[in-house]
Amino acid sequence: TADADTQDAAEETTEAKDYGTLYVSFPTGNIRIAIDILAQQLGYFKEEGVTVEEVNLGGMDALTAINSADGNLDLLTTGFVADLQAIGSGYDLTVIGGTAVEGGAIITKKGNADQYKDAGTILNFDAVKSAKLGLQRNEAAWVITRQYLLDNGVTEDEITAIEDESTGNIAYYADQTAVAQAVQKDEVNLAFLPLEYALLYADAYDLEVVAKAGDLQENYVCCREVTSKARLAEKKDAFVAYEKARIRAFEYYKQGETDDSVRQDVVNIVASWSGKETDYVDTYLYGGVTKYATDPNTAGIVKYVEAANNSGLLQSAGIDFASYDIKQNVDTSAYGQAITELAKENPDNAFYASLLEQYNTDNQ
């Protein structure tokens, strides 16, 4: 039949594309990388002509592998503060795309949230200033909250007082569980957690969300995709193909927001890959916990670096991020080519058109 012929022709064309292999960080069980998991499991990487080898490596080990000529890793897709600290140490890193945005929460004990809220300013600044705070060091939700307070008239001196550990105004904890327990035991009044932990631990530790950090700064960047400038130059076509496949997987994920059968398929694929329970995966992907975004978002990176630097996260980094132009370490060309080509090849696709518009706005 004609359809079969078309399909055969399409398959032949697909087979003709071979842009080689990319070694990509897929940390075991980590579903923050759901878009990559989908692109792999649905065969989109292959269709676009790139072989993606999954490497169970994350954090500084991954950045070191990317930075070294003989390291067997091309791309890290989770985290961002560590990327900036590595750039400060002289690593040859460049951001080429995004994994997710937002994702932090301000929490308190059940029944206490209202006293920290304000209808006009989201947070009641006086209540926040007099509260005892708990968090894990480098927690993005605090970085964003801190910047929000500064942007709304809270002075540097007041922030310094809040962050003075010797006064007991702030306490740092080893992990997210310890932060949640500190709220439950009334060791702290307000705490900062990734949103998934705030929701996961709500019942077990009597927590409620005061505000999402994304309410304070919409679309603030978190997990970015980084490679090295050398690897990007060497494997540019493979990176473009990789980004095309990811954008297609992102579209499929978004369809799950309105189509139950797609949602179920997405959840099953990610649950099967990760070994996590389907209910947990469903909440994580579609329950308002995670906001995915494939765009590199240069504007958001610049804004986040300012906030992170103001909070002291980057002081030991080796360069002064107040004067350093982080755009030197952002290369949007692979993603830009991918979304431009997809939008051109699919002129009736409103999703691609909106991503292209977003790309043009956020990456001046």
Predicted regions and their residues:
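Gram-positive cell-envelope targeting signals
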Residues: 1-14, 145, 242
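Sec/Tat-exported extracytoplasmic proteins
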Residues: 43, 48-49, 70, 77-80, ...
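Solvent-exposed, polar/charged alpha-helical surfaces in well-ordered, non-transmembrane soluble domains
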Residues: 34-37, 42-43, 64, 84, ...
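Conserved C-terminal helix/tail region of periplasmic/extracytoplasmic solute-binding proteins
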Residues: 306-364
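Secondary-structure end/capping motifs
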Residues: 234-320
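Short, glycine-/small- and polar/acidic-enriched structural segments
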Residues: 11-175, 189-195, 209-213, 218-219, ...
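Short linear loop/turn motifs
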Residues: 53, 60-61, 161-168, 282-292, ...
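Pocket-lining segment of extracytoplasmic ligand-binding domains
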Residues: 172-272
